[in-house]
């Protein structure tokens, strides 16, 4: 059976939210329903103790709305001194929400793994920290307990996620960098070629616009030649002047029996028969003045 890693898991419980709602006061209770929560943590122990204490003494309640609390030795201490070991962000949460101040006071009496509300951005973002409390020297000590952070979780709306570790983040960044670097090298490899005479060199880029223009001109030229071979639909007095190239080809064919004539010397390719320039001029004038016959 494949188990999804916790850092790839997204969990939510719409049914729980529909019954109890989701706010800062009960966000830890909502988190306790998720698979991220450790049932052996101190939070679970305190939760069970509260349930039994409420059954034994229904009128038991602690007023935590004041800034002064009574210490076990009977002396009053200032909350700033009591929670001096807590970071300022969490300290503001403790002062604003008395229930978390009471939870912190109870956690101070225990050693082990615990969950605390680390950051709040109402109405839809909370950060919960998993930490280990060790060397607990008791309530009211100036030194305070030693706290080791273990893991952070964040709640966005109704979804709970486990924050990735530094190793996962660096690994993801390195894999992304390696992928893009490999793609770049493959693109560069396609731009070079090897020739025995020149060695390795870059290919000459082909101008696609020039190629497209040449192809278009070729199509237009082909279309023009096709149009010239079609008989016009106008009157009978319309005539077409044949090109010099066609006349020369005709003369060459007539005078040499299909052999080629050198236009510069006026001689055939084999030198057996020849046509003078004067004969070519007469044939040119005759062909221009004549009326062409269309096929």
From Swiss-Prot:
GO terms for molecular function: transcription coactivator activity. InterPro entries: Mediator_Med6, Mediator_Med6_fun, Mediator_Med6_sf. GO terms for biological process: positive regulation of transcription by RNA polymerase II; positive regulation of transcription elongation by RNA polymerase II; positive regulation of transcription initiation by RNA polymerase II; regulation of transcription by RNA polymerase II; RNA polymerase II preinitiation complex assembly. The modification Phosphoserine is found at residue 225. Its main location: nucleus. Gene3D superfamilies: Mediator complex, subunit Med6. GO terms for cellular component: core mediator complex; mediator complex; nucleus. Component of the Mediator complex, which is composed of at least 21 subunits that form three structurally distinct submodules. The Mediator head module contains MED6, MED8, MED11, SRB4/MED17, SRB5/MED18, ROX3/MED19, SRB2/MED20 and SRB6/MED22, the middle module contains MED1, MED4, NUT1/MED5, MED7, CSE2/MED9, NUT2/MED10, SRB7/MED21 and SOH1/MED31, and the tail module contains MED2, PGD1/MED3, RGR1/MED14, GAL11/MED15 and SIN4/MED16. The head and the middle modules interact directly with RNA polymerase II, whereas the elongated tail module interacts with gene-specific regulatory proteins. PANTHER family: MED-6-RELATED. Belongs to the Mediator complex subunit 6 family. Present with 4824 molecules/cell in log phase SD medium. This is Mediator of RNA polymerase II transcription subunit 6. It comes from Saccharomyces cerevisiae (strain ATCC 204508 / S288c).
């Amino acid at each position: 059976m494949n188990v999804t890693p916790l850092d790839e898991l997204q969990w939510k419980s719409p049914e729980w939210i529909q019954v109890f709602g989701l706010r800062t006061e009960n966000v830890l209770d909502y988190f306790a329903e998720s698979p991220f929560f450790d049932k052996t943590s101190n939070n679970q122990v305190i939760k069970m103790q509260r349930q039994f204490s409420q059954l034994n003494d229904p009128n038991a309640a602690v007023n935590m709305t004041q800034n002064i609390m009574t210490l076990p030795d009977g002396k009053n201490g200032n909350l700033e001194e009591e929670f001096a070991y807590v970071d300022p962000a969490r300290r503001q949460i403790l002062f604003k929400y008395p229930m978390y101040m009471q939870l912190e006071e109870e956690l101070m009496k225990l050693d082990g793994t615990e969950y605390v509300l680390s950051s709040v951005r109402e109405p839809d973002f909370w950060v919960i920290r998993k930490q280990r409390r060790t060397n607990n020297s008791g309530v009211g000590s100036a030194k305070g307990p030693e706290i080791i952070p273990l893991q952070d979780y964040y709640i966005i709306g109704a979804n709970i996620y486990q924050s990735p570790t530094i190793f996962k983040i660096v690994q993801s960044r390195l894999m992304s960098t390696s992928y893009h670097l490999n793609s770049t090298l493959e693109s560069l490899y396609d731009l070079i070629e090897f020739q025995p005479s020149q060695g390795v060199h870059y290919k000459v880029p082909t101008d696609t616009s020039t190629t497209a223009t040449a192809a278009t001109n070729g199509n237009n030229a082909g279309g023009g030649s096709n149009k010239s071979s079609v008989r016009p639909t106008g009157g009978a007095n319309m005539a077409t002047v044949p090109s010099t190239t066609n006349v020369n080809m005709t003369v060459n064919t007539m005078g040499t029996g299909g052999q080629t004539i050198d236009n510069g010397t006026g001689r055939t390719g084999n030198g057996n028969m020849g046509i003078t320039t004067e004969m070519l001029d007469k044939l040119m004038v005759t062909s221009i003045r004549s009326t062409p016959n269309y096929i």
